[in-house]
Amino acid sequence: MSDKTRLLEGKVSSVAMDKTVVVRAERYVKHPLYGKFVKKTTKYYVHDENNECKEGDVIKFKETRPYSKTKKWCLVDIIHREK
């Protein structure tokens, strides 16, 4: 894994597809005019080869080659499992 590979963390919001999970990653962006930090949420489609993620899990995922039109990320590690 090179240093330029993007690693992100997010919470799994859907596991309805085979070998794919939908992850929501939050980030804070400063408003250009008012200066307040606003929470932004981005939805990522992540490749989960063994279907090991459950809804609510917090995972770490990295950018990789495109698996499909929308899926360009793959699972690295499950940080916290939802009970």
From Swiss-Prot:
UniProt xrefs under InterPro entries: NA-bd_OB-fold (IPR012340), Ribosomal_uS17 (IPR000266), Ribosomal_uS17_bact/chlr (IPR019984)
Transmembrane parts of this sequence: none
Gene Ontology molecular function terms on file: rRNA binding; structural constituent of ribosome
SUPFAM superfamilies recorded: Nucleic acid-binding proteins
Keyword terms, alphabetized: Ribonucleoprotein, Ribosomal protein, RNA-binding, rRNA-binding
GO cellular component, as recorded: cytosolic small ribosomal subunit
Coiled coil: none
Disulfide partners: none
A Pfam family hit: Ribosomal_S17
A single BP term in Gene Ontology: translation
CDD domains recorded: Ribosomal_uS17
Entry function: One of the primary rRNA binding proteins, it binds specifically to the 5'-end of 16S ribosomal RNA.
Subunit structure: Part of the 30S ribosomal subunit.
Family the UniProt entry places it in: Belongs to the universal ribosomal protein uS17 family.
Listed NCBIfam families: PRK05610.1, uS17_bact
Protein's name according to its UniProt entry: Small ribosomal subunit protein uS17
